[in-house]
């Protein structure tokens, strides 16, 4: 992962941790693998104990603000802790890849 992307992940993560209780955050995808092109987005998974549509919108707003400052689009996917650890998404290739290859923030 490029240093600038790691700094962006840390900046995003700090804002999320200031806003939500005990979130888990991982970057994944092409920017983590080093295969990104300049137009690639930064994929980030956020796991919260619980969330509603307002919380999801707030995560997106934080992503937009952090990414805008860096000129990078941050794409987020949000799961509840139960979904991520035990629900149907936990068996998906996406969640498995995030767990194996993602960079925790």
Where are these regions (language model features)?
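Catalytic core of pol beta-like nucleotidyltransferases
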Residues: 1-24, 32-34, 38, 48-105
């Amino acid at each position: 992962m490029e240093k600038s992307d790691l700094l962006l992940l840390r900046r995003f993560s700090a804002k999320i941790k200031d806003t939500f209780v005990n979130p888990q955050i991982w970057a994944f995808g092409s920017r983590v693998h080093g295969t990104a092109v300049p137009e690639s987005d930064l994929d980030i998974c956020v796991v919260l104990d619980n969330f509603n549509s307002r919380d999801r919108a707030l995560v997106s707003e934080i992503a937009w603000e952090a990414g805008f400052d860096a000129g990078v689009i941050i794409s987020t996917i949000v799961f509840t802790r139960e979904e991520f650890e035990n629900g149907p998404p936990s068996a998906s290739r996406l969640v498995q890849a995030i767990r194996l290859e993602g960079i925790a923030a």
